[in-house]
Amino acid sequence: MVFLPDNILILGHGGFGFNTNVFETNIINLAAVVGIVVSFVGKNLSSLLEDRKNTIVKNLEEANQRAIEAEQKLTAARTQLETAKKKAQEIREEGVLRATQEINNVVSQHELRLARLQEFKQETLAFYQQKAFKQAYLYVINKIMTRVRERLNKGLDSTYHVVVNNFYVSRFTQF
C-alpha cells in the first residue's frame, strides 16, 4: 500500500482509490446512504405515510360525524327545552285558572251561606217576634179573662149588665 500526497490510497495496480478527505467523503457517503434508504425504505415509508394519512382522515371524518351528532342532539335538547317551557307555561296558566275558579267557587259558596244565615236570622227573628206577640196576647187575654171572671163572680151591677147586653146585641146584628 502506497500513500500518495493527494490523500488517495491506491490498492494494487489500477486499483481502487479511497479519498480520505473527510468532508467530501461524508457528503458522498451521505448521498449513497440516502439513496439506499430511499430505494429500500421509500416504498414502506410512503405506505406508512399513506396509512397515517388515511387514519388521520378517518379520525377527522369521525370527529366531524360526532360534531354533527352533537349538534343534532343539542338541537333536539333545545326543542325539548322549548316544549318543556311551553308545557310549564300551560300548567302555570291552568293553575292560575283553576285557582281563580276555586276562589270564585268558594266566594259564591260563602255568599250562599251568608244568604242562608241571613234568611235563618230573619226566620228566627220572626219566630221570636211571633212568640213574643203570642205571649203578650195570651197575657192580655188571661188578664182580661181574669177580670171578667172577677166581675162575674162579684156579680154584675146595672152598668155592666147593660154593657154586656149591648155587646151581645151588636154581635147578633152583625150576622
From Swiss-Prot:
Q: Which organism is it from?
A: Chlamydomonas reinhardtii
What membrane topology does the UniProt entry give?
A: Single-pass membrane protein
Q: What is the lineage of its organism?
A: Eukaryota, Viridiplantae, Chlorophyta, core chlorophytes, Chlorophyceae
One Pfam family of this chain: ATP-synt_B
Matching CDD domains: ATP-synt_Fo_b
Q: What else is known?
A: In plastids the F-type ATPase is also known as CF(1)CF(0).
Q: What is this protein for, i.e. what is its function?
A: F(1)F(0) ATP synthase produces ATP from ADP in the presence of a proton or sodium gradient. F-type ATPases consist of two structural domains, F(1) containing the extramembraneous catalytic core and F(0) containing the membrane proton channel, linked together by a central stalk and a peripheral stalk. During catalysis, ATP synthesis in the catalytic domain of F(1) is coupled via a rotary mechanism of the central stalk subunits to proton translocation.
* Main subcellular location of this protein, as a coarse class: plastid
Localization terms from the record: Plastid, Chloroplast thylakoid membrane
Query: Keyword set for this entry?
Result: ATP synthesis, ATP-binding, CF(0), Chloroplast, Hydrogen ion transport, Ion transport, Membrane, Nucleotide-binding, Plastid, Thylakoid, Transmembrane, Transmembrane helix, Transport
Q: Which residues cross the membrane?
A: 22-42
Q: Please give an example of a GO cellular component term from this record.
A: chloroplast thylakoid membrane
Molecular function (Gene Ontology), one example = ATP binding
Presence of keyword Membrane: yes
- Know the name of this protein? ATP synthase subunit b, chloroplastic
Task: State the family it belongs to.
Answer: Belongs to the ATPase B chain family.
Q: Which InterPro entries match?
A: ATP_synth_b/b'su_bac/chlpt (IPR002146)
Task: Note the subunit structure.
Answer: F-type ATPases have 2 components, F(1) - the catalytic core - and F(0) - the membrane proton channel. F(1) has five subunits: alpha(3), beta(3), gamma(1), delta(1), epsilon(1). F(0) has four main subunits: a(1), b(1), b'(1) and c(10-14). The alpha and beta chains form an alternating ring which encloses part of the gamma chain. F(1) is attached to F(0) by a central stalk formed by the gamma and epsilon chains, while a peripheral stalk is formed by the delta, b and b' chains.
